[in-house]
């Protein structure tokens, strides 16, 4: 499991003084990119080779709101499922370790614009999958 801590900035909150729903996707995207970089995956280097990892579906369940200045953590796990990479991202408010949001992101791989069977995921994330088997 990978985790990334962050803090809610006031401008991310709406009139009810809770984090606007769209910002949770920003948090998850940022954590996903940091996670992949920690595994040595460079989106720009892959793109230059004609390989693109693309989000095909995102599901978000809002459990408890985050508020301005809350410290939180995005926790990530992933697995292969057919041609897709499934990335599970849960956001926890660190004040009491309370689940705020559950997310699941499906990622596909394109090779020069063509959908692949996801073989690249096995290559890119072999160490992660071996360690977390």
Description of each model-found segment:
Residues 1-54, 110-133:
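Hot-dog-fold acyl-thioester-processing enzymes
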Residues 3, 67-68, 79-133:
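HotDog/MaoC-like acyl-thioester-processing domains
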Residues 35-73, 77-85, 102, 106:
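Hydrophobic beta-strand-centered segment that forms part of the acyl-chain substrate-binding groove
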């Amino acid at each position: 499991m990978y985790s990334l801590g962050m803090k809610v900035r006031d401008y991310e909150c709406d009139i009810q003084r809770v984090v606007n729903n769209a910002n949770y996707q920003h948090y998850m995207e940022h954590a996903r990119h940091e996670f992949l970089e920690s595994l040595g995956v460079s989106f720009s280097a892959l793109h230059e080779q004609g390989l693109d990892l693309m989000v095909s579906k995102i599901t978000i369940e809002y459990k408890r709101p985050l508020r301005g200045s809350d410290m939180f953590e995005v926790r990530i796990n992933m697995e292969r499922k057919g041609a897709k990479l499934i990335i599970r991202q849960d956001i926890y408010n660190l004040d009491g370790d309370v689940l705020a949001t559950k997310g699941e992101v499906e990622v596909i791989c394109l090779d020069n614009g063509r959908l692949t069977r996801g073989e690249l995921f096995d290559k890119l994330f072999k160490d992660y999958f071996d360690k977390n088997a």
